[in-house]
């Protein structure tokens, strides 16, 4: 090799070594810079988390030993978490404090995570229950404590990708085994341990590390890990609480059975929905867990959904969380949820406590066992605001006498007396109605037979709000029935929501919520339970008001008739029979008046030939003929309108019964003849078909047909006793009778079966009474004498 070649090789070697030294030094500087940066970040993060009870410190097995810089522990509140290779010591020392061993669990790569508590603790911490992470497609912010061999742990804020189960750090990769924490309010909760080799976050089975990890298949509660809803239930109701909104997505009332104390009966809509769309008649209907942290299995049927749930099978058509019950909202339209994403801190059979991820809202639902269809909610607000409202939720649709009858009312104290005022329902053009200057004792959002009463137990500002929600935004379950025929289009049934304001300061606000039937037995119990020491009752019974144009007149009488019906129901055990017995009772009560009317009609029939003579005699003098006829009526004590009297007598009772059936929840779902008359507040159904027919719909109702036949027969029996040719007036009466029979048949075709039973029974008893009275009068000729020109005539 010549000198030139040797010089070239030497220069290349020197350049290579120089490059190695240069890049090595740069790597060293970069590594050192990164280490310093990580140390700075660690110090900054720990400084910020110290006030929240999270810190990192070395630990040793005795106070005499020199602090081992290779062993570090994470302090979370009054607990200590440390990693080891197993065989945890019974006690350790950290920050000059003795910590006693509580429990240990095996994590990834045979690494053990041990839990220690302060030495002065005398009890072992109980399992605090699952803490469910908010379900979101976005990365979840977490705090990571990364343990590296023979180095002080690195602490940084990272991101947790729920779908992949990975933890990310924007500055560098996560190399070492790490403990991951999730901030909830003003504290950090242990979320799990991150396996950097498999890039997977795994949960830890320790009392204070019960946060759910959705991608962890090894979790003891894997079924609960995907839960989005929590079920709190008793014998009266099933509450479905949303993890996203922290509010109530569903209030399901069980049908009456031997296993519960509910008074809600199954009706035709429930059976049809279960048969046509069973997935939409399932309860809870959404992935849920109970107080035991186990998934709650769906059941098809068995419940009445008091709140609109939307279309469960279509996530886009479910009821938006802003319309959930007991949601905290704000904004111009009062539809913006204040907080989104909640964790559970306490969950047992009677109480569910949640806190929003940002710590601004805390809710506690308490479900008493003895108060029917009632529960309490405590709302803790940790930030002052002048625009916070609590919602009632939107009741499901009830069809009453073939009509949709929502109502909003509020109860106030005026002149030391309770008063129930009705709220005019808002319209689509002006969907939000705000009222100030009023202090409601409670506010009712009703669909007819059911209602949601929101009653503040602590002081709140004056005012209330009522909101109109388009039916397409919160579709009713009825829209799923016969969708091809558009029997119950969602747009036809808008929703209505009530709201109460919250105080403009931090604090805890309590509310009593009644969510159930507007029935005397349950509301009376609630009134008694919440009567104060002064004997002042909240007067929830005022919710039961009679509906109708003449309710202000019929209400006292309807209340009296219902008392009589309840007496007959107590004797017979059947509401249908009690309606018939009530009809018999009223017929006996009015027997003298009806008998007088029938006798008067018989006298009219006897006078018919003489009236014809007068009309023929004074054919050219109609006024004289009219005067003579009236004199004849007066002489024989006959009134021409007595023929209409039996029907006129019955009309007030008919109106009262109509109002009674629309206002008495106990008759809803009450069966009389199974398979035919299954609900006294709905039309009877002898049979049905698929394609609707004009007027008849897709159901055949027999009771109105029978009613028309009886009315026609009564008119015929009345006409059969007339002698001689019929007068014009009599022919008009016969025509009117036939028309009335047809009119009542058509008018009553879609009326409640209970009303048809009453009217049919009344007409049938009237027919029997008329036949019986005619027989008696025929056997007593002297009683049928008439006078013409002051002479006795037969």
UniProtKB/Swiss-Prot annotation:
Protein's UniProt keywords contain Glycoprotein: no
Any one annotated GO CC term: plasma membrane
HAMAP family, alphabetized: YidC_type1
Species per Swiss-Prot/TrEMBL record: Chlamydia caviae (strain ATCC VR-813 / DSM 19441 / 03DC25 / GPIC) (Chlamydophila caviae)
Principal localisation: membrane
One Pfam family this sequence matches: 60KD_IMP
UniProt protein name: Membrane protein insertase YidC
Subcellular location: Cell inner membrane
Lipidation (N-palmitoyl cysteine): 19
Taxonomic placement: Bacteria, Pseudomonadati, Chlamydiota, Chlamydiia, Chlamydiales
């Amino acid at each position: 090799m010549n000198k030139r070649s040797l010089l070239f090789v030497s220069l290349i070697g020197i350049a290579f070594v120089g490059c190695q030294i240069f890049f090595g030094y740069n790597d060293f500087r970069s590594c050192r810079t990164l280490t310093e940066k990580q140390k700075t970040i660690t110090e900054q993060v720990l400084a910020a988390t110290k006030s929240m009870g999270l810190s990192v410190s070395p630990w040793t097995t005795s106070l005499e030993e020199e602090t081992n810089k290779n062993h570090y522990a994470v302090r979370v509140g009054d607990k200590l978490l440390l990693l080891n290779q197993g065989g945890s010591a019974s006690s350790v020392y950290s920050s000059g404090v003795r910590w006693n061993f509580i429990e240990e669990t095996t994590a990834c790569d045979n690494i053990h995570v041990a839990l220690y508590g302060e030495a002065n603790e005398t009890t072992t911490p109980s399992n605090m229950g699952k803490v469910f992470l908010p379900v979101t497609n976005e990365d979840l912010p977490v705090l990571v404590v990364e343990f590296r061999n023979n180095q002080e742990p690195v602490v940084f804020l990272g991101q947790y990708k729920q779908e992949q189960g990975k933890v990310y750090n924007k500055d560098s990769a996560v190399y070492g085994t790490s403990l991951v924490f999730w901030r909830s309010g003003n504290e950090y909760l242990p979320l799990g341990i991150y396996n950097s080799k498999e890039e997977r976050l795994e949960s830890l089975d320790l009392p204070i590390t019960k946060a759910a990890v959705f991608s962890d298949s090894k979790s003891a509660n894997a079924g609960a890990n995907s839960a989005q809803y929590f079920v709190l239930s008793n014998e009266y109701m099933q509450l479905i609480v949303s993890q996203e909104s922290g509010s109530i997505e569903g209030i399901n009332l069980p049908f009456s059975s031997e296993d519960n104390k509910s008074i809600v009966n199954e009706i035709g809509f429930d059976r049809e929905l279960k048969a046509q769309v069973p997935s939409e008649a399932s309860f809870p209907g959404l992935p849920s867990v109970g107080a035991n942290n186990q998934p709650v299995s769906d059941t098809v049927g068995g419940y009445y959904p008091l709140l609109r749930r939307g279309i469960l099978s279509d996530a886009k058509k479910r009821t938006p969380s802003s319309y959930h019950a007991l949601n905290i909202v704000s904004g111009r339209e009062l539809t913006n949820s204040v907080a989104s994403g909640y964790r559970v801190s306490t969950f047992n059979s009677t109480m569910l406590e949640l806190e929003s991820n940002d710590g601004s809202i805390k809710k506690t639902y308490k479900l008493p066992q003895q108060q029917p269809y009632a529960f309490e909610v405590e709302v803790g607000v940790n930030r002052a605001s002048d625009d916070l409202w609590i919602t009632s939720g939107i009741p499901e649709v009830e069809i009453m006498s073939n009509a949709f009858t929502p109502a909003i009312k509020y109860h106030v104290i005026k002149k030391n007396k309770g008063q129930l005022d009705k709220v005019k329902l808002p319209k689509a053009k002006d969907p939000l109605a705000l009222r100030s200057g009023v202090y409601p004792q409670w506010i009712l959002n009703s669909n007819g037979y059911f209602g949601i009463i929101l009653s503040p137990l602590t002081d709140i500002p004056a005012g209330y709000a009522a909101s109109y929600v388009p039916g397409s935004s919160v579709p009713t379950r009825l829209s799923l029935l016969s969708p091809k025929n558009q029997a119950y289009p969602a747009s036809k049934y808008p929703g209505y929501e009530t709201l109460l304001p919250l105080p403009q300061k931090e604090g805890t606000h309590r509310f009593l919520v009644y969510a159930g039937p507007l029935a005397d037995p349950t509301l009376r119990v609630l009134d008694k339970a919440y009567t104060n020491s002064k004997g002042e009752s909240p007067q929830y019974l005022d919710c039961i008001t009679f509906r109708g144009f003449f309710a202000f007149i019929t209400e006292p009488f309807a209340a009296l008739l219902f008392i009589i019906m309840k007496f007959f129901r107590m004797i017979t055990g059947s509401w249908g029979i009690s309606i018939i017995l009530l009809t018999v009772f009223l017929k006996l009560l009015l027997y003298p008046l009806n008998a007088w009317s029938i006798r008067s009609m018989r006298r009219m029939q006897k006078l018919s030939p003489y009236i014809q003579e007068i009309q023929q005699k004074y054919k050219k003098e109609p006024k004289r003929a009219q005067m003579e006829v009236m004199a004849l009526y007066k002489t024989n004590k006959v009134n021409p309108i007595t023929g209409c009297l039996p029907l006129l007598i019955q009309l007030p009772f008919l109106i009262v019964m109509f109002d009674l059936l629309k206002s008495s929840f106990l008759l809803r779902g009450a069966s009389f003849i199974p398979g035919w008359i299954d609900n006294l507040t709905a039309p009877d159904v002898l049979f049905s078909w698929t394609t609707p027919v004009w007027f008849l719909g897709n159901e055949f109702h027999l009771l109105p047909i029978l009613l028309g036949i009886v009315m026609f027969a009564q008119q015929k029996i009345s006409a059969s006793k007339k002698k001689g040719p019929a007068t014009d007036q009599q022919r008009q009466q016969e025509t009117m009778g036939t028309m009335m029979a047809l009119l009542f048949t058509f008018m009553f075709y879609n009326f409640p079966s209970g009303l048809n039973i009453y009217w049919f029974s009344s007409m049938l008893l009237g027919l029997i009474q008329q036949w019986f009275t005619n027989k008696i009068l025929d056997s007593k000729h002297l009683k049928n004498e008439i006078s013409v020109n002051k002479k006795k005539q037969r």
